[in-house]
Regions:
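An N-terminal, well-structured beta->alpha segment
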Residues: 4-103, 196-228, 236
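Gly/Ser/Thr-enriched, mixed-charge loops and adjacent short helices
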Residues: 28-35, 39, 151-278
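Phosphate-binding and adjacent anionic-ligand microenvironments
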Residues: 287, 291-293, 333-527, 534-536, ...
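Conserved phosphate/anionic-ligand binding catalytic regions in large, soluble enzymes, centered on
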Residues: 35-55, 143-146, 232-240, 244, ...
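Short acidic, glycine/serine/threonine-rich loops at helix termini
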Residues: 97-102, 127-131, 149-155, 239-244, ...
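N-terminal small/polar loop signature for handling phosphorylated ligands or for N-terminal nucleophile
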Residues: 87-150, 246, 251-306
Length: 568
């Protein structure tokens, strides 16, 4: 019962006083929400609201996660894990720095060394550092682009990739073995330093990482006669992102108000480059300086948003559109230079547009689809190392891209450099913007349009309704929708596909999602978010014109939402 857990916290003599105050200010309903069950690992690790309780992120739940990780590393690697150590980074959020040090204190109690970044750093740099330092694992304290009252905890394997379920599930089971959050052993910072269990890292890793990022350039000597507005949205790319662009010769105008590491993200409604509102200050500056390109990264610098000048205003590209532009640029330019491999591979996910895959296949390359979550792409990049195939590009619709595998997660710094280069190249050689180039791509491969509907459903009742909706689409699959017959149904939880009445097995890991593909090539996916209390509905269509594709997109969306609304 949640009340028993609540009383345990209230009667705990060592409970942090601020957290105790937090509990005293809660209503009974609020207390039930924060004690009904523990935080769980999702597609992006653990994310939760800051505060007291087992369903909130605080020093005790952070200790619990690290205790499980420490025991997992010692069980699977033995004492070598102590020498390899764990790399730890954090973002600009409230309690991030404290949680990062708290992680080192728990690991140190098990004799495991920590390499702790001296200040906030981009998540992709954590992936790089874990690989470079040959560490046993990596940790980053971040909630990505979630609201300011959230924080999070992500763990990476020795290859710099987020743990996939077969390993993460073992870690989670070991985390859940912790029954008393107040008895977890820690050691002080002073003891960590005295016993050489804590090493601070920073500038030397920055330089190595940035040199690798610069290696992705295809036409580094292209004339850079474009103006770029850059905003880190108060996050971790402020220093490295600006330095990267300026050191490679671009004229950059940073949004100064958003270069500040503000944990409240006070200048934006949401620090998410997927949202148009996040670009408001960048657009204002862009109009002032007549910029050609606007670039925004999310707070932990793994996602990239791009906006392109059109007339007197700016058009925001979707993640799918940016991905298509980047893959087209990589393949066309490397083909000109004769640097394309014979057996190149491109990765995307089950909710990503078909456009990038069509481009890759037109160049004769294999396209491998993964489940949602960049950890699956990172895992696949590693698998290629023992084959004669070469990684070309990986991306997903949610504004995540990776060009080279020295990082095994999405990397906004790689993406912003290549997007800037593509914009400069097309401007100089074809007198075209990225938006005009996208229209060229549409002419060749067809117009592709996508949409994402987020349905927020909070708390215990919300979680139940999300499950009920997905189950309705799973247990009783539709045979048609929006006057289109269903041609393919895929269930990723029970790992099967039905096409033309024939049932075949899917080889993906299991995840709670279903996909429908219609006779006209349109498709949609329903899945609960792995990091937030919401149901996600992804839709993709193709058409001869942008207008006809958007009409189809809206029509399918309305039909799905009408069905969802009937499920209580």
């Amino acid at each position: 019962m949640w009340k028993d857990e609540y009383l345990r916290w209230m009667n705990e003599p060592t409970l942090d006083l601020e957290l105790k105050k937090d509990l005293l200010n809660k209503t009974e309903k609020e207390l039930e929400e924060i004690f009904y069950g523990p935080l769980t690992f999702g597609t992006g690790g653990i994310r939760g609201i800051l505060g007291a309780g087992i369903n909130r992120l605080n020093i005790y739940t952070i200790r619990k996660a690290n205790d499980g990780l420490a025991r997992y590393l010692l069980k699977t690697k033995g004492d070598i894990a102590k020498l390899q150590g764990v790399v730890i980074a954090h973002d600009n959020r409230r309690m991030s720095k404290e949680f990062a040090l708290e992680s080192a204190k728990v690991l140190g109690a098990y004799g495991i060394k920590s390499f702790l970044f001296e200040d906030l750093r981009p998540t992709p740099e954590l992936s790089f550092a874990t690989r470079y330092l040959k560490a046993a694992a990596g940790i980053v304290i971040t909630a990505s682009h979630n609201p300011p009252n959230y924080n999070g905890y992500k763990i990476y394997d020795e290859f710099g990739c987020q743990f996939t379920p077969q390993f993460a599930d073992v870690i989670v089971s070991m985390v859940n073995e912790v029954t008393d959050l107040f008895q977890i052993k820690t050691v002080s910072k002073e003891v960590l330093i005295e016993k050489h269990l804590l090493t601070y890292i920073g500038q030397e890793i920055d330089e190595l990482y940035l040199n690798e990022v610069k290696s992705i350039q295809i036409n580094p000597q292209v004339k850079k006669d474009i103006k770029i507005v850059f905003t880190p949205l108060h996050g971790t790319s402020a220093e490295l992102g600006l330095s990267l662009l300026e050191s490679t010769g671009y004229l950059v105008y940073p949004v100064l108000e958003q270069m500040v590491h503000d944990s409240s993200f006070s200048t934006v409604k949401s620090p998410n480059p997927e949202n148009a509102s996040a670009f408001e200050m960048a657009i204002a500056l862009g109009k002032k300086v007549d910029a050609d390109l606007l670039i925004a990264t999310d707070p932990d610098a793994d996602r990239l948003g791009v906006a392109v000048k059109q007339g007197n205003d700016y058009v925001l590209l979707t993640g799918n559109q940016t991905g298509a532009i980047l893959i087209n640029y990589i393949l066309s330019e490397r083909k000109k230079q004769g640097t394309l491999p014979e057996n190149g591979v491109v990765f995307n996910t089950i909710v990503t547009s078909d456009l990038g895959a069509k481009i890759a296949r037109a160049y004769g390359f294999n396209v491998i689809q993964t489940l949602t979550g960049f950890k699956y792409i990172g895992e696949q990049i590693r698998y290629l190392e023992n084959t004669n195939q070469e990684f070309i590009f990986g991306y997903e619709e949610s504004y995540g891209y990776v060009i080279k595998g020295f990082v095994r997660d999405k990397d906004s710094l790689q993406a912003l450099l290549l997007a800037s280069e593509a914009a400069a190249y097309y401007q100089h050689y074809e007198n075209k913007t990225l938006l005009e180039k996208l229209n060229d791509i549409y002419e060749t491969y067809g117009v592709h349009q996508e949409a994402l509907h987020n349905i927020d459903l909070f708390g215990i009742e919300g979680a139940k309704r999300i499950q009920a909706i997905v189950e309705r689409f799973r247990v009783n699959p539709l045979t048609s929708i929006n006057h289109q017959n269903v041609m393919v149904f895929e269930d990723y939880l029970y790992s099967y596909r039905i096409e033309k009445g024939y049932k075949t097995a899917l080889s993906f890991d299991k995840t709670n999602a279903v996909k429908y593909i219609l006779e006209n090539g349109s498709w949609f996916v329903l899945r609960p978010s792995g990091t937030e209390p919401k149901l996600k509905i992804y839709i993709g269509v193709t058409g001869k014109t942008v207008e006809s594709a958007r009409i189809e997109l809206d029509s399918i969306g309305q039909a799905i939402l009408a069905l969802v609304d009937q499920i209580k």
